[in-house]
A protein has these predicted regions:
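Divalent metal-dependent catalytic cores for phosphoryl transfer on phosphate-bearing substrates
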Residues: 1-180
């Protein structure tokens, strides 16, 4: 479930509750009742990036943390090897770094899920920088290291396994709708 931790982000939750008022505002939603495609208040918002940053904030330095971070980031096939702002993406003037709708200093609340515990986390984007910074090696350096370690085909295979598992879990949840539903 770490791959959907970013669904706890305020931008994502605002989007989820847009079509229905919260019965319990403390209960996060993972799926929306809105018809059509999701539009977030921040253009280009990707919950996968928030999930990956939350994972690394709590697990960086552990065995295979970069691989898990990569798989979290890539689980919808939109973001993989680079962290960057999109063309025409704009942040508030107060934010130093921003990418894919995530602003430096955004936060994720604490969450208990599947026997895991995620602490409240402030998201940092120093990984966007080149070289080694205050979060260690840049994301580009980490991703290229994974590419070198696993090769493009094995890395793509691992990504495919995670994406298929996510699709199957989503399909199973839709067969048995829940009230709310933790990310």
């Amino acid at each position: 479930r770490w791959h959907d931790l970013g669904k706890l982000h305020a931008v994502f939750q605002d989007s989820m509750y847009r079509c229905r008022p919260p019965a319990d505002p403390a209960q996060p939603l993972a799926k929306s009742d809105c018809a059509g495609s999701m539009r977030h208040s921040r253009s280009f918002f990707r919950h996968e990036l928030a999930s990956m940053l939350g994972w690394l904030a709590q697990h960086d330095g552990e065995a295979d943390a970069d691989l898990i971070a990569y798989l979290i980031l890539a689980h919808h096939g939109k973001v993989r090897m680079s962290l960057r702002a999109m063309p025409n993406e704009q942040a508030d003037p107060d934010f130093r770094r921003f990418a894919r709708g995530i602003h430096e200093g955004d936060s994720l609340p604490a969450m208990e899920f599947d026997g895991e515990h995620s602490v409240a986390t402030t998201l940092r984007l120093a990984l966007m920088e080149i070289g080694i910074g205050d979060q260690g090696p840049s994301w580009s350096e980490r991703a290229l290291g994974l590419l070198e370690r696993f090769g493009p085909f094995r890395l793509a295979w691992l990504e495919t396994l995670v994406r298929l598992a996510d699709w199957r879990a989503s399909a199973a949840e839709q067969l048995e709708p829940r009230q709310g539903g933790n990310p």
